[in-house]
């Protein structure tokens, strides 16, 4: 999954997010992840998210270019959303790079909107 995500510049990965880190995330009970495969068994899409109390997050979503605009991303988001809703998540959030216009259009089409009056603060641990 990590190798698949790293193929796409628009998927935000920090240097510290390596395969070991991803394996640690995947075994957590609060993680939701799905893969989409083509008929040859190759990964063509992936989503990774998590649950934080009553909120959920999509950390990464990627779809191979030749499979975009075919509903793969939408189905991956719906699967992750269903997992979260089933365990009581009431709201989902995600981060999109300011320069990722296609990503902004995709997430808007999925019903997400930019919050007003909020700013994200982060720090490395």
Stretch-by-stretch model annotation:
Residues 54-65, 94, 122:
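Conserved acetyl-CoA binding element of GNAT-fold acetyltransferases
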Residues 77, 84-96:
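Conserved GNAT acetyl-CoA-binding A-motif
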Residues 42-50, 57-62:
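Conserved beta-strand in the GNAT
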Residues 39-45, 102, 115:
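Glycine-rich acetyl-CoA-binding "A-motif" of GNAT/NAT acetyltransferases
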Residues 12-40:
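Active-site rim helix/loop that mediates acceptor-substrate recognition in acyltransferases
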Residues 60-63, 69-82, 105-109:
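Conserved acetyl-CoA-binding loop-helix of GNAT-fold acetyltransferases
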Residues 68, 94-103, 122-125:
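Conserved beta-strand-loop-alpha-helix junction that forms the acyl-donor binding cleft
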Residues 1-15, 38, 118:
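Short amphipathic alpha-helix that is part of the acyltransferase structural core
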